[in-house]
């Protein structure tokens, strides 16, 4: 996958993507990140990319000309089709389902906003998608872009050591992930669950599914309303409820 990022602060992307999993993915040519400063496409003497809003109001808006020219230049250099994504608090909420959707593309173009927002013509005539990472406001879209890039990159085959790694992540199957343990089996008097030492994979799988359901039920019960639970899942939930609320 190729990801083009349009930003006013290209330096912000240097360190995070030169380390760990993303660096290995880039070294294998599984993911290619290209950063473009759209200030380079402003042609006035001050290289201005923002201006005051018509009708008055607080803040400055990103002008349409530099953004349109930047996207057009990027597409001229490489005509591979790509969604043009605005990162904005007004967009659809980013989640694991959206990450999977984006991971199916060969290429993404991501525009990082700044200041008060965009001239509406950018939203109407340039962007093909608009994404928000949550109901809060950031100074710019750069951190949001990093979140999207990281989440999407993990889903590209070969980026993680095993495809099972991304499939078992929280939210990948609609549930929070089960607890994990490693050596030592006893630490400061705290034991790991006996079933994990049993070698019985069927029991271990059942325990993991049950604990995933338990954690989701406790922390994010809303998630259970969005998935189809099997008869076995419902039986596990009944067991959990009986354990959590024992009768006298």
UniProtKB/Swiss-Prot annotation:
Intracellular or extracellular location(s): Cytoplasm
Keyword Endoplasmic reticulum: no
GO biological process: tRNA N1-guanine methylation
Catalytic activities: guanosine(37) in tRNA + S-adenosyl-L-methionine = N(1)-methylguanosine(37) in tRNA + S-adenosyl-L-homocysteine + H(+)
Top-level taxon in the UniProt lineage: Bacteria
InterPro entries from the UniProt entry: Alpha/beta_knot_MTases (IPR029028), tRNA_m1G_MeTrfase_C_sf (IPR023148), tRNA_m1G_MeTrfase_TrmD (IPR002649), tRNA_m1G_MTases_N (IPR029026), tRNA_MeTrfase_TRMD/TRM10 (IPR016009)
Annotated TM spans: none
Coarse class of the protein's main subcellular location: cytoplasm
Keywords: Cytoplasm, Methyltransferase, S-adenosyl-L-methionine, Transferase, tRNA processing
Family per record: Belongs to the RNA methyltransferase TrmD family.
Subunit (UniProt): Homodimer.
Name of the protein: tRNA (guanine-N(1)-)-methyltransferase
Species lineage: Bacteria, Bacillati, Chloroflexota, Dehalococcoidia, Dehalococcoidales
């Amino acid at each position: 996958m190729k990801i083009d990022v349009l930003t006013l602060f290209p330096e912000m992307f240097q360190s995070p993507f030169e380390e760990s999993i993303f660096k290995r993915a880039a070294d294998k040519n599984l993911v290619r990140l290209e950063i473009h400063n759209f200030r380079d496409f402003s042609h006035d003497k001050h290289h201005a990319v923002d201006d005051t809003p018509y009708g008055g109001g607080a803040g400055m808006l990103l002008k349409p000309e530099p953004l349109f020219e930047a996207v057009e230049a990027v597409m001229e250099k490489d005509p591979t089709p790509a969604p043009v994504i605005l990162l904005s608090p007004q967009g659809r909420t980013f989640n694991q389902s959206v990450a999977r959707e984006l991971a199916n593309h060969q290429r993404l173009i991501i525009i990082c906003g700044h200041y008060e927002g965009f001239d509406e013509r950018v939203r109407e005539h340039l962007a093909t998608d608009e994404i928000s990472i949550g109901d809060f406001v950031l100074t710019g879209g750069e951190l949001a872009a990093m979140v999207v890039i990281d989440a999407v990159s993990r889903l590209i085959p070969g980026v993680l050591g095993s495809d099972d790694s991304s499939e078992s992540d929280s939210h990948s199957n609609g549930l929070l992930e089960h607890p994990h343990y490693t050596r030592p089996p006893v630490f400061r008097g705290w034991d790991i669950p006996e079933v994990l030492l049993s070698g019985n994979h069927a029991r271990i799988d059942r325990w993991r599914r049950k604990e995933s359901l338990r954690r989701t039920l406790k922390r994010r019960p809303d998630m259970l309303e969005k998935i189809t639970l099997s008869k076995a899942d419902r039986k596990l939930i009944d067991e959990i409820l009986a354990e959590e609320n024992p009768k006298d």
